[in-house]
Amino acid sequence: MLNSGSLIWLRIDYMALTMMGKKRGMIQLFDEKGNAIVCTVIQAEPNVITQIKTKETDGYTALQLGFEKVTGKTQHTIEARTGKPRLGHFKKAGVESRRFLVESRLDSTEEYTLGQEISVDTFNGIEFVDATAISKGKGYQGVMKRHNFAGGPASHGSGHHRHAGSTGMRSTPGRGLPGGKKAGQMGNERVTVQNLRIVKVDSENHVIVVKGQVPGPRNGLVYITQAKKLAKKKS
């Protein structure tokens, strides 16, 4: 259990299905009180079941989902873009080639079959979700942008306006300790945002609208799963 301000965060021990979708952009909506809320639109075309794992054959129970068909002008192009190992995998499942795969551990897979499509209706009745994506790459950045350092003096004549400052000590230990905050590659890493409230599930257009920001650029791949923590107000 984690305490944070006036909320108590409870870790939920369960296994939930993970779907894949594409971030289509951000919009502004109004809640029932007339307050403007910033939302992210995620379009999740039906994910297809490409493999069902069981304890007898694999040692654990899980579902593997595929997302976004591999496209090409000819069948040869599609097969070349898929690769022979995956071609055999999809052929065994009886589904068309998919670009992305994700596996979700579940307590039971009895209600699922190979080739079955999983739609956004899965999230009907769910209030919060977690979203995982690759964040936007910012390239090589300094410590002020990357780590929010204050920087040096801004006055004229100072030679270290945006420098990091001291990075170590003297003869003891005589080296810079590893793990220090320095300039370097920023972004382009796997980021998870937890407890995004679902504002709307549009089954007809395969869209989920969540309150808040989701990592990554427009049209970036997003993994969506039921929230692993639930927030409850302190009694």
UniProtKB/Swiss-Prot annotation:
Disordered: annotated span: 150-189
UniProt keyword terms in alphabetical order: Ribonucleoprotein, Ribosomal protein, RNA-binding, rRNA-binding
Molecular-function GO terms, alphabetical: rRNA binding; structural constituent of ribosome
One Pfam family it belongs to: Ribosomal_L3
Keyword Mitochondrion: no
This protein's GO CC annotations: cytosolic large ribosomal subunit
Single GO biological process annotation from the record: translation
InterPro entries: Ribosomal_uL3, Ribosomal_uL3_bac/org-type, Ribosomal_uL3_CS, Transl_B-barrel_sf
NCBIfam families: L3_bact
Alphabetized HAMAP family for the sequence: Ribosomal_uL3_B
Family label: Belongs to the universal ribosomal protein uL3 family.
Function (record text): One of the primary rRNA binding proteins, it binds directly near the 3'-end of the 23S rRNA, where it nucleates assembly of the 50S subunit.
Subunit composition and interactions: Part of the 50S ribosomal subunit. Forms a cluster with proteins L14 and L19.
Name used for this protein in its record: Large ribosomal subunit protein uL3
Organism annotation: Protochlamydia amoebophila (strain UWE25)
UniProt gene name: rplC
